[in-house]
Amino acid sequence: MSPEAIPDPESMLAEQAHDALDPDLRRSWQELADEVREHQFRYYIRDAPIITDAEFDQLLRRLQALEDEYPELRTPDSPTQLVGGAGFATDFTAAEHLERMLSLDNVFDLEELAAWAARIRTEIGADAQYLCELKIDGVALALVYRDGRLERAATRGDGRTGEDVTLNARTIEDIPERLSGTNEFPLPTVVEVRGEVFFRVADFEDLNAGLVAEGKPPFANPRNSAAGSLRQKNPAVTARRRLRMICHGLGHVESSGGSPFPTLHDAYRALKAWGLPVSDHTAQVTGLDAVTERIAYWGEHRHDVEHEIDGVVVKVDAVALQRRLGATSRAPRWAVAYKYPPEEAQTRLLDIRVNVGRTGRVTPFAYMEPVKVAGSTVGLATLHNASEVKRKGVLIGDTVVIRKAGDVIPEVLGPVVDLRDGSEREFVFPTHCPECGSELAPAKEGDADIRCPNTRSCPAQLRERVFHVAGRGAFDIEGLGYEAATALLQAGVIADEGDLFGLTADDLLRTELFTTKAGELSANGKRLLANLGKAKAQPLWRVLVALSIRHVGPTAARALATEFGSLEAIETASEEQLAGTEGVGPTIAAAVIDWFTVDWHRAIVDKWREAGVRMADERDASIERTLEGLSIVVTGSLAGFSRDEAKEAIIARGGKAAGSVSKKTAYVVAGDAPGSKYDKAIELGVPVLDEDGFRRLLAEGPERDAEDGEPG
C-alpha cells in the first residue's frame, strides 16, 4: 500500500492535551469535537476507520469529560449528543425511522458495569432481570413491516434518519419478505425491527479470497465488509456477498392491543415466531453476578460462534422499566455494551511512512508483517506523531506488540526489546511534505504534530477540503463524495473548492468517473450538476461552514449568520463585533478575521458569489419576530421538527437557539428523552415547554405563553 492510499488520519489524540485552565478552552473543545466527528465519518460513511474502537472510545470519553466539567461547552451538535452517523451526506435516499434508533453506551471493565447496574437498582429498587446478548460486530439495520410485508430497510444513520437500503436488504437470505403471525403472537399492523447485518467468519474469508483472485483489494475485517456490501449501489453485488442478519430489538409498533410485549424476552420469542432470525445465545438472568458470569463465559468462547463479537450487550428485560429509565440523546439508559479488552499479537515492523491529513497534520504509519488478530489480518497501524514514535521506543525492524480493539486499524504498543539483533534502525521524520514537497514544521511552538504549511495547494489537503464542502453540515451536496472530489482534482477540472459551483457538463466529461463508455455524461454527473445548482440556495450558515474557517462549525456559523445576515457584513466586521456575538467569542472571532486576510480565501468567496451562491439571508417579512432577544434551548426529539428546523424556526423569529441551559435561558423546549438539559432547566427554574407549547410560543410569543400558563 502506497502512502497516497492511506485513509487520511486527520485528527489524532495528541493535539488535544490542554490544561483545563487554558484560556483557549473552547478552542480545545472544538478541535477535540472535530477530531471525533472526523473518525465518525470514516467509520460510518467511508467504512474505512483509521483508529481502533478503543482509541475512538477514549476520544469520545475525553470530550464527554470536558463537557461534564464545563457544561457551557456542550452543544446540541456535539458528538456526545448525537448518534454515530449524524451530520454526514451519503449517496443513498434518506429514510426516517419511525422511532429513534439509538446507539449504546459502553463499559470496559466490571467496575464500570457495576456502577451502571447500581444506577439501575437505585432507580427501580431491586435487582433487575436482564437479557445478555452477544455484541455482533456488524452494521445496524432497521426493518419496517406493514401488514406483515417488508416495506423498508434503513441503516441507523443519525438515529432519526438513515439510508434506504431496501433493495439490498431484500437480497439477504435471513430477511423474510413476509412475516407469519401465530395465535400467541399475532402480527402488529406496523412493526419496526432492529438488528445487525454481518458476515460469518467463513463467508468473509471466502469473499476476500474471491476479491484477491479478481485482482481487487480484500476487506480489512468483517464489519467493514458488511457495511460496504450492504451499501452497494448494485443489489446484485450485495446478493453475492452472503450477508446474514440477527434481530435484537423493536422500534415502533402499532398494535390494536396496545403494547404487545411485557418483556424484551417475549418480543424475541415473537420475532422468532414471525420468521425473523434471532440469536441462540441470548440469556435471561437476574442480578449483576449472573451478568458477569455470562460476560466471563463469552470472553473465553468469543471465537466459538460463527460471527465476530466484541462484547456482551446487557439490557433490562422489562419493557415498563425500560420506559421508566428512559434514554439520553444518543443511548438508552436501560442497556449497556460491555466491551472486551483488545486482543494483542506480535509482528515485525517493516517500515514507518507518513501521510498528510486535511489540516496538514503529518502522521506516521507502521507497516508490519501481516499478522492474524481478532480473526482478521493486520499489517498497518497509526503511530500518531513523531513524539509518539519516540515515546513508544519502536525502531524499524523491531518485533512489536500490537493491540486490536474491535476490528479496525490496530495500535502499536511497543517493541519486544529482547528480540533485537542490532539490525534495527531509527525512524527519521521527513523534513518535507511527501505530497507537495513543502517544508514541514509545527503550527506553533510546542505542538506535538508536524504540519504541511501548503494549505492552498497540497493535494492531500485539497482533497479533504473539497470533500468537506459537500458534507451534510455544509452545503449537503449528494454525489460529491470522496471519490468524486479526488477525480475532479486529479483531472484538473477544478483547482480548488472555489471552482465547484462553476462546473459544467463539459467539465465533468473530462473525468472518467462521470463519463459513460459512449462518451456521454453519466447519470451521476447529471445528478451532481443538479445538486450543485440546488446547493447555491443554501442558507448563509452553511456557506460559512463550507469555507473551512478554523473553529467555525454549525453552531458558530448560525450565530454569525443570525447576527450579521450576510457574508459581506461578517467579512467587514471588527474582531470585537464578531467576538461579541453570543456563541462566538474571541477565539472564533480571531479565526474569522485571520481567514479573510488570505487572498485565495477571498477568491473562493468571489468565485462562489459569481456562480450564484447565496451570500446573504433574506428575512421572511411574513414571519413575525415573536421571539426577539429570547434565548431558547431545544432538547430531546420533537415529532414535528428536526434539530435544524427547530433552530431555524427560533432564529427566523428573532430568537437565539442556544446549546446549553443557563439563567439567561428564556425557555427550554423538551421533546422525547430530553436528557440533562431538562434537569438543568428544572434546577434553575427555567420554564419548560412541550412541543405544543413550543408551537404556540413560535406563533404568539411569550405573552400568550404566560397567559396560557405553560409549565415551568
Swiss-Prot record:
EC numbers, comma separated: 6.5.1.2
Gene3D superfamilies: 5' to 3' exonuclease, C-terminal subdomain (1.10.150.20), 6.20.10.30, BRCT domain (3.40.50.10190), DNA ligase/mRNA capping enzyme (3.30.470.30), Helix hairpin bin (1.10.287.610), Nucleic acid-binding proteins (2.40.50.140)
Residues where Zn(2+) binds: C433, C436, C452, C458
Catalytic activity: NAD(+) + (deoxyribonucleotide)n-3'-hydroxyl + 5'-phospho-(deoxyribonucleotide)m = (deoxyribonucleotide)n+m + AMP + beta-nicotinamide D-nucleotide
Domain BRCT: 622-711
InterPro entries reported in the protein's UniProt record: BRCT_dom, BRCT_dom_sf, DisA/LigA_HHH, DNA_ligase, DNA_ligase_AS, DNA_ligase_CS, DNAligase_adenylation, DNAligase_N
Taxonomy, superkingdom: Bacteria
UniProt-annotated binding residues for NAD(+): D53, A54, E55, F56, D57, S103, L104, E133, R156, E196, K315, K339
Pfam families the UniProt entry points to: BRCT, DNA_ligase_aden, DNA_ligase_OB, DNA_ligase_ZBD, HHH_2, Nlig-Ia
Keywords: DNA damage, DNA repair, DNA replication, Ligase, Magnesium, Manganese, Metal-binding, NAD, Zinc
Cofactor(s) needed: Mg(2+); Mn(2+)
Active site: K135 (n6-amp-lysine intermediate)
Coiled-coil region(s): none
GO molecular function, one term: metal ion binding
Function noted in UniProt: DNA ligase that catalyzes the formation of phosphodiester linkages between 5'-phosphoryl and 3'-hydroxyl groups in double-stranded DNA using NAD as a coenzyme and as the energy source for the reaction. It is essential for DNA replication and repair of damaged DNA.
NCBIfam families xref list: dnlj, PRK07956.1
Protein family: Belongs to the NAD-dependent DNA ligase family. LigA subfamily.
Designated name of the protein: DNA ligase
UniProt source species: Mycolicibacterium gilvum (strain PYR-GCK) (Mycobacterium gilvum (strain PYR-GCK))
